[in-house]
């Protein structure tokens, strides 16, 4: 499959939770058979997709845990009080907030407008670059 089909799969049926993926419908995808080289259409189910991405989901959880372990006590207190905010396209992966929250015991939320908020925040930082430099 190509990148566009992979993105469609992620949006429509991918889940960070194998257990909850069982509740999601399957979908038909089209691509090229790697053995024959011919076009092929197959049905894939959400559980298989969830199993296929589990290593990536676990890597995200490990990275979050390592970051939390290295965080100052003051920031850790803020994280406990206010939670973790997910941004970017990956934040839209079904059940990701719940999976991360279960693993970290910290509330997890999806940012408002997760696809654009990083770019918007970067733009705001660039507008205030002198203030940012003084904070160092």
List PLM regions with ranges:
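Phosphate-binding glycine-rich/basic clefts of nucleotide- and phosphate-handling proteins
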Residues: 1-54
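Charged, alpha-helix-enriched surfaces in structured cytosolic catalytic cores
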Residues: 1-4, 8, 44, 48, ...
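Glycine-rich phosphate-binding loops at beta-strand->alpha-helix junctions
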Residues: 14, 76-100
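Short flexible coil/turn linkers enriched for glycine and charged/polar residues
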Residues: 21, 36, 80, 102-104
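PAZ/PAZ-like end-binding module
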Residues: 35-40, 44-45, 64, 104, ...
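Phosphate/ATP-binding catalytic cores across multiple sugar-kinase/actin-like superfamilies
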Residues: 52-79, 125-128
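Residue-level signature of catalytic and energy-coupling elements of molecular machines
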Residues: 64, 86, 122
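Conserved phosphate-binding/catalytic loops in two-lobed NTP-binding clefts
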Residues: 98-124, 132-136
């Amino acid at each position: 499959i190509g990148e566009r089909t992979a993105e469609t799969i992620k949006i429509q049926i991918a889940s960070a939770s194998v257990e909850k993926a069982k509740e999601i419908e399957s979908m038909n995808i089209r691509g090229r058979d790697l053995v024959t080289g011919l076009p092929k259409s197959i049905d894939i189910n959400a559980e298989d997709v969830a199993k296929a991405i589990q290593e990536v989901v676990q890597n995200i959880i490990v990275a979050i845990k390592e970051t939390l372990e290295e965080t100052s006590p003051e920031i850790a207190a803020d994280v406990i009080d206010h939670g973790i905010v997910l941004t970017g396209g990956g934040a839209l992966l079904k059940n990701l907030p719940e999976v991360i929250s279960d693993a970290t015991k910290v509330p997890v939320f999806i940012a408002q407008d997760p696809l654009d908020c990083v770019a918007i925040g970067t733009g705001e930082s660039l507008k205030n670059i002198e203030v940012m430099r003084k904070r160092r």
